[in-house]
């Protein structure tokens, strides 16, 4: 009787695990599905031809915006700069 109870519990645990879709890989917070829901966007592909569906609203909350600062480099005019000129070949000449 106890063996039957253990088997039933294990059966329901195994079924509950398979009901949830698999998570996406490579640190993407989403699920692998055949079709994404209306509020989801597909970030990248999953295995077996499925899409990695990410909730767009949740993704915006957790995404941190970083400001990219470009440093302006003043070029020294005393330095010599090299240029390489590549030869070109004209196949057709179009006259208008």
Curated annotation (Swiss-Prot):
It comes from Mus musculus (Mouse). The gene is Defb20. The lineage of its organism: Eukaryota, Metazoa, Chordata, Craniata, Vertebrata. PANTHER family: BETA-DEFENSIN 123 (PTHR15001:SF3), BETA-DEFENSIN 123-RELATED (PTHR15001). This is Beta-defensin 20. One of its GO terms (biological process) is innate immune response. It is found in: Secreted. Keywords: Antibiotic, Antimicrobial, Defensin, Disulfide bond, Secreted, Signal. Belongs to the beta-defensin family. Residues 1-21 form the signal peptide. Transmembrane segments: none annotated. Disulfide bonds join 24-52, 32-46, 36-53. It comes from the Eukaryota. InterPro entries: Beta-defensin (IPR050544), Beta_defensin_dom (IPR025933). One of its GO terms (cellular component) is extracellular region. Has antibacterial activity. Its main location: secreted.
